[in-house]
């Protein structure tokens, strides 16, 4: 197993490149929350796989970001990267401790399952209120 250590402004981000059957693991401190489904670990942007949070100008957008800031900002996370990339972001499932960040924000009613990418693993955590208030983007279907 190879390990690459990146130092970024007094911050350590550690990436383990596993074998072909295991995901690449990135660990580090969350330095910025862009919105409800995108965080930055060190200077590396991560898009939460299978999670669709509202944009900042949409209903619940600012609440979803505030929830995410409270949950992860300044905390150590572990992200299992899929190998995919969207825009400038790597894609992965991230955990703070044993808590799946995607499960947490969807259970709170501030994001939806994006079944095209999640395989439906978060659907059971969606709330009725979120289903009424958040518009699922076409790319999630």
Task: Give the positions of each predicted feature.
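Sec-dependent signal peptide recognition
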Residues: 1-7
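Small beta-barrel nucleic-acid-binding modules, primarily SNase/OB-fold domains
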Residues: 2, 12-141
């Amino acid at each position: 197993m190879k390990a690459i250590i990146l130092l970024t402004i007094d911050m350590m981000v550690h990436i383990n490149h596993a074998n072909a059957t295991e995901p690449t693991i990135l660990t580090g401190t969350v330095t910025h929350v862009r919105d409800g489904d995108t965080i930055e670990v060190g200077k590396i942007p991560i898009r939460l796989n299978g999670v669709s949070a509202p944009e900042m100008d949409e209903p619940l957008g600012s609440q979803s970001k505030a929830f995410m800031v409270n949950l992860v900002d300044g905390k150590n996370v572990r992200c299992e990267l899929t190998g995919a990339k969207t825009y400038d972001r790597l894609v992965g499932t991230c955990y703070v401790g044993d808590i799946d960040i995607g499960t947490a924000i969807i259970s709170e009613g501030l994001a939806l399952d994006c079944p095209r990418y999640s395989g439906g693993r978060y659907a059971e955590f969606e709330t009725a209120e979120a289903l009424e208030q958040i518009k699922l983007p076409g790319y999630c279907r």
